[in-house]
């Protein structure tokens, strides 16, 4: 993956899945809007997973060219994850079309985890700009660690839908991230380090 790839081309690639998600918001095709709900949620999870894989990939591949490219561009994937999560949320709100029903369902486990994940997405996206990074200093890194919390909540939200009957798809999606995260923890805390020589 070329390190010089323009961010504008990357943004275009990240936006491509959204092209077919626009028209259902302007017609009364409930089935199409339901498709947007599912598709946007899945792409949000995928882009978040990709952004979180950057650091463990750097370790496991000893800083391969692709891993370095992903690390340098992971913020774009994170912002794209938020954007698709926003589309996902909008599709849900419009599809329900009832504030009373939305509030009644908000405390159910599958939806509560989704709302909490989206709240974290908002705070992470709001502080993703260079100005926020400079202003927050070390606090920015602390806040970014909550991305892992958003990932866990997203996994629980997706897996618990329909009474946990659809847990296989989220498990498959998150398995590579889980494996790489375990490797990262092993590398940081459990690996045998060479003894220092006097």
List each language-model region with its residue ranges.
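Membrane-embedded alpha-helical bundles that constitute the cytochrome b-like, heme-associated redox core
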Residues: 1-198
């Amino acid at each position: 993956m070329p390190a010089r790839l323009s961010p504008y081309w990357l943004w275009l690639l990240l936006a491509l899945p959204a092209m077919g998600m626009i028209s259902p918001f302007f017609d009364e095709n409930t089935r199409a809007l339901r498709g947007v709900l599912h598709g946007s949620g899945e792409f949000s999870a995928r882009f978040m997973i990709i952004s979180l894989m950057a650091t463990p990939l750097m370790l496991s591949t000893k800083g391969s060219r692709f891993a370095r490219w992903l690390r340098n561009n992971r913020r774009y994937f994170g912002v794209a994850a938020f954007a698709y999560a926003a589309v996902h949320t909008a599709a849900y709100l419009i599809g329900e079309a009832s504030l009373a029903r939305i509030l009644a369902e908000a405390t159910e486990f599958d939806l509560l985890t989704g709302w909490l994940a989206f709240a974290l997405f908002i705070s992470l996206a709001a502080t993703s700009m260079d100005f926020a990074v400079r202003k927050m200093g070390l606090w920015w890194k602390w806040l970014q660690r909550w991305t892992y919390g958003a990932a866990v909540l997203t996994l629980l939200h997706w897996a618990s839908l329909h009474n946990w009957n659809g847990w296989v798809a989220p498990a498959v999606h998150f398995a590579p991230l889980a494996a790489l995260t375990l490797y990262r923890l092993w590398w940081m805390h459990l690996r045998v380090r060479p003894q220092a020589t006097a």
